[in-house]
Each structure stands twice: as C-alpha cells, then as structure tokens.
C-alpha cells in the first residue's frame, strides 16, 4: 500500500515501515560513530523497548556495548489493510540490524504489567543468557491492568489543587491557544501513581531477583522527567509528578537490595524530547519547540539517542569505572544542559511573546512537527513515500 500520514489529535494513526527502519538505522549509526562503550553491560533487559528512550537504550546497549538484549513491549503488528504501530516496526528493524551484526536479540510482545510477561522473560533469560547485568525500565503506558484483579487503572495528566491555564500550541491548527486543565481528584492522583509510579519496576526486579537471574553488580535504571517552572504545574507538581516521585522511592528501596551484590538502582532524569508521550502533555510541544531552538543555538541539543549514549558512557559505565555523579536524591541528571540558567531564562522571557503569527520564527515549531512525524516513519530523508510498501513485517518476537 501507499502510506501517508493521518493525524488524529496527538497521534498519527498510520506508520511507515521503511521510514521507521531508516530512523533505527540512523540511531545505530550515531551510536557506532561514538565508538565502543568501555565497561558496558553484556546482557541487557529493556522493559518498554520499542520507542523513545527505551529503544535508544536497547540500541546503545547492543551497538555501543555489544550486548545481548531482550526487549519487552506492547505493540500491534500490521494487517493487510492497516499499518502496524511504529514500535512494532522499530523493534523489527532493531532485530534485523542486530542479527546482521551477530548480536543476540529476542523480543516479547504483550502487557509488561502482567505476571506472564515477567515469567516469560525469566524463562527466556534462563534459557538463553543465564543472567542479566542491566535492567532498563522505560514504560510509558497510560493504563495498567492489575494482575491480581484484572482491574484497569488509568493515569491522568492533570495539575493538583487548582485549574491550570497556560499558553499552549494546538498542533493540529498550528495556533497558539490558552489551554486549561482541571485539577486531579485524590483518586486520580493515586491511580496515576499506580500506573506510572515505581511499583511495577519493583515487581520486575523482585521477580528477576527471586528467580536468580540478576548477575552480581546488576544495574537498573528507570527514566523520569522533572522539567522547569514552565512545565511544573502540569508535570512535576501534578499527578504525573507524584508518580515520578514514587519512582524515586522505589529506586531507594531497590538500591538497598541490589547493593548487597554490588548492584545499583537509579532514576535517570532526562531532557524533554519529542515522543508520543510528551506530545500528549499540554504545554510540552510549545516548551519543546522553544527549548530545542535555544539548545541548538548553544550547541547542546540532544535527541533520545545522544542522551542515552551520554548516560551509558559518562554516567553508569565510565571508562575509569568510577561511580556516577548523582544529585541529592541519588538521581542521574541528564537534564543538566536543558536546565542551564541561560537556556531557561530565554524560555521564560520568550513564553509570553509567542503568538500564532511568530510561532515559527521564535521557536523550532516546524522542526517539532517534523520530528513528531518522524516518530511514525514519515518525513525521513531517503524514503520514497510514493512507493508501494508491504505493511506486514515479521521478526523474531514471541507473544506474552
């Protein structure tokens, strides 16, 4: 079929398999250009490995460190009439390129919150790898089905206490608007912590530990975002922030447990990037368009891949083997460049000046839209979008 982008809200409902493959190839090339990572882990599990920071982690481990990787994700394959999800095509491309390099790559597709996902992963590790040296926890799901009851819990992107009103951009109309979001109820806050907090990370680590598949010195990392005062009301000070604080709680508990065998657990605070997850958060697209422009001008812009490469090589797996720098909460801070005072001051001063008319001049909004479409495989250099492509792409993946 000839596949063109179809946007609905903040989701593109079509995806391009060739474009997605090109994206993955580009990220692999970037990783290889950095050279091999010293002291890199050799057997890595990535929970939530099909897009964004999770995919970058898998690529970095495999192509930067030569690791055998297992990826867990929840994606949809294509049918003859409907394209698969971008994460499906990303994972297929990763698997193809890993195998071409002679790297071990296995993937499990299904609900990572389920007990079955944990058990199947453990069985696979025992069968193929014996143990693992690193666990990356990178789930960004809006819902969680509770294994014991089958109840489906939903998270909320809402402030706490007061209605939040701010300048935002309507990405469908390319217009500056005023966005208002009602505050979360106490139940919605608790539900958001249940879905996006640290409990499932702990359950994964406990299951892996109890099964004896964590090697001595195993490191685990989960990803977070704190942001700045421009986004705090909807993010860090909102329901989502409470969930991210729960990740910090989980990291402390896990770090104590893993330290007995020389391992570590950290939350890594990353910079804002264009992902399906961030595009759903009010004010984030406008903030990202603003901060990206300034960071590019300052020569400190990073995408997902650059961020994770820096986390591996300059934080967790340093050449001299030294412990990474952390903040007072034991977090790895990769948002350090974004939070530079000159960059944030620029954004604070620019925010009230942006209008629909000057949006494209004052910010990198055009690039934001291009990067958003790229997530789904569109607008990628070197891809002919008028060519008939087969949406059905198979690879080495087992259903959970």
UniProtKB/Swiss-Prot annotation:
A GO molecular function held by the record: enoyl-[acyl-carrier-protein] reductase (NADH) activity
Gene Ontology biological-process entries: fatty acid biosynthetic process
Pfam families listed in its UniProt record: Eno-Rase_FAD_bd, Eno-Rase_NADH_b, Enoyl_reductase
Entry binding sites for NAD(+): 48-53, 74-75, 111-112, 139-140, 244, 273-275
NCBIfam families, per database record: EnoyACPredFabV, PRK13656.1
Complexes and interactors: Monomer.
Name under which the protein is recorded: Enoyl-[acyl-carrier-protein] reductase [NADH]
Encoding gene (name): fabV
């Amino acid at each position: 079929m000839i596949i063109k982008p179809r946007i609905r809200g903040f989701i593109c409902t079509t995806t391009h398999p060739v474009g997605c493959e090109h994206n993955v190839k580009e990220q692999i090339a970037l990783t290889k250009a950095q050279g091999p990572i010293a002291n890199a882990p050799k057997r890595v599990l990535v929970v939530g490995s099909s897009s964004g920071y999770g995919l970058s982690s898998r690529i970095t481990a495999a192509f930067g460190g030569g690791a055998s990787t297992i990826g867990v994700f929840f994606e949809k394959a294509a049918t003859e009439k409907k394209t698969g999800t971008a994460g499906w095509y990303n994972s297929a491309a990763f698997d193809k390129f890993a195998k071409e390099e002679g790297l071990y790559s296995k993937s499990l597709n299904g609900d990572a919150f389920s007990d079955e996902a944990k058990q199947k992963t453990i069985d696979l590790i025992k069968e193929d790898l014996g143990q693992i040296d690193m666990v990356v926890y990178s789930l960004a799901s809006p819902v969680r089905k509770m294994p014991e009851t089958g109840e489906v819990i939903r998270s909320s992107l809402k402030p706490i206490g007061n209605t939040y009103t701010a300048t935002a951009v309507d990405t469908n109309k390319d217009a500056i608007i005023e966005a208002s979001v009602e505050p979360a109820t106490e139940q919605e806050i608790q539900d958001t912590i249940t879905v996006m907090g640290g409990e499932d990370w702990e359950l994964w680590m406990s299951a892996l530990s109890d099964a004896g598949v964590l090697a001595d010195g195993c490191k685990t990392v989960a990803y977070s975002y704190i942001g700045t005062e421009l986004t705090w009301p909807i993010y860090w000070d909102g329901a989502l922030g409470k969930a991210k604080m729960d990740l910090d709680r989980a990291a402390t508990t896990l770090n104590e447990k893993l330290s007995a065998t020389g391992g570590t657990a950290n939350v890594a605070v990353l910079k804002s990037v264009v992902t399906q997850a961030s595009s759903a958060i009010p004010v984030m697209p406008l903030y990202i368009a603003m901060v990206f422009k300034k960071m590019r001008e300052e020569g400190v812009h990073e995408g997902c891949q650059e961020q994770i490469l820096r986390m591996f090589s300059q934080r967790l797996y340093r050449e001299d083997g030294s412990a990474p720098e952390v903040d007072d909460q034991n977090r790895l801070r990769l948002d350090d460049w974004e939070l530079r005072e000159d960059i944030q001051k620029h954004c604070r001063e620019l925010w009230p000046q942006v209008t629909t008319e000057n949006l494209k001049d004052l910010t990198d909004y055009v690039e934001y839209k291009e990067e958003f479409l790229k997530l789904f495989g569109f607008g990628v250099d070197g891809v002919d979008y008028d060519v008939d492509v087969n949406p059905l792409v198979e690879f080495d993946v087992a259903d959970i």
